[in-house]
């Protein structure tokens, strides 16, 4: 959960103990996980469930933009919905003006943060904390 290729990415790809014979731990149950592991597990579950239930994410079109100042933005969309993903890979919070993404954002005036359920009533500028990504379901 915290290894960033230091010195390799082997820790990121390590075996997941899920209760099979010989596993000392069972990370598929909340009892077998730490509070931080439960937080990560719930995060992945929420994203996986959202992806499963929204066709734009698995069968929609992709529109992405070149990263600017280590901020990356892309959209997955279909006739039913549009999902925006914005990522800040820097060590500092950043404000991301969205005017340059008008080709994909035209007509949308609000959004819902998929991870927090927070509503955004303005899409003019996105506030992105350091080292985070947001997943926004756009609305009119």
Feature roles, as predicted:
Residues 83, 113, 133-135:
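Generic alpha-helical hydrophobic packing signal
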Residues 1-105, 128:
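Loop/helix patches that line or flank the sugar-binding groove of alpha-linked glycan CAZymes
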Residues 77-79, 116, 139-140:
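Short, flexible beta-strand-to-coil junctions
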Residues 47, 111, 131:
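A residue-level signal for conserved active-site and pocket-lining positions in enzyme catalytic cores
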Residues 60-62, 108-111, 136:
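Short glycine-aromatic motifs
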